[in-house]
């Protein structure tokens, strides 16, 4: 297979409309745009959300909420993800090294999702009640 020989499957693409090729084609003269008006002109049309001069919906409704900057640097870690970490100690740096969390993450919380197969030591991470019970049941421990 070569890139220059690739083509779409037969019948997968519709032929483009050939506009302005005589009245017999059905798309001659006005080319499917009707007569006059803003939408018939080249470059004609209105922007998204424009309601003809009436105050548009997105401006009639109040602003609300914000994006928490802390949420951008916080991540959840599942119990099943702990198996991807080499070694017995799990902290922020070992999670980043194992590609479990992104490089920009500064806070992480271990949640109860999946199972933990081996005893691990959690260091410097927040842990939910259920995850704490599962880690301790597997013989692991949590260090603050």
Swiss-Prot record:
One of its GO terms (biological process) is translation. Residues 21-31 have a biased composition (Gly residues). Disulfide bonds: none annotated. Residues 1-53 are annotated as: Disordered. One of its GO terms (molecular function) is rRNA binding. Keywords: Ribonucleoprotein, Ribosomal protein, RNA-binding, rRNA-binding. One of its GO terms (cellular component) is cytosolic large ribosomal subunit. It holds the Pfam family Ribosomal_L27A. Binds to the 23S rRNA. Belongs to the universal ribosomal protein uL15 family. Part of the 50S ribosomal subunit. This is Large ribosomal subunit protein uL15.
């Amino acid at each position: 297979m070569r890139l220059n020989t690739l083509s779409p499957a037969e019948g997968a693409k519709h032929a483009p409309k050939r506009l302005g090729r005589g009245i017999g084609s059905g798309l001659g003269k006005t080319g499917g745009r009707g007569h006059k008006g803003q939408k018939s002109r080249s470059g004609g049309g209105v922007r998204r959300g424009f309601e003809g001069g009436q105050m548009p919906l997105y401006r009639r409704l109040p602003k609300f909420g914000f994006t928490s900057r802390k949420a951008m640097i916080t991540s959840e870690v599942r119990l099943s993800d702990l198996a991807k970490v080499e070694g017995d100690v799990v902290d922020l740096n070992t999670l980043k090294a194992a590609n479990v969390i992104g490089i920009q993450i500064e806070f992480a919380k271990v949640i109860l999702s999946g199972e933990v197969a081996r005893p691990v030591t959690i260091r410097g991470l927040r842990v939910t009640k259920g995850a704490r019970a599962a880690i301790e049941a597997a013989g692991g421990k949590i260090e603050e």
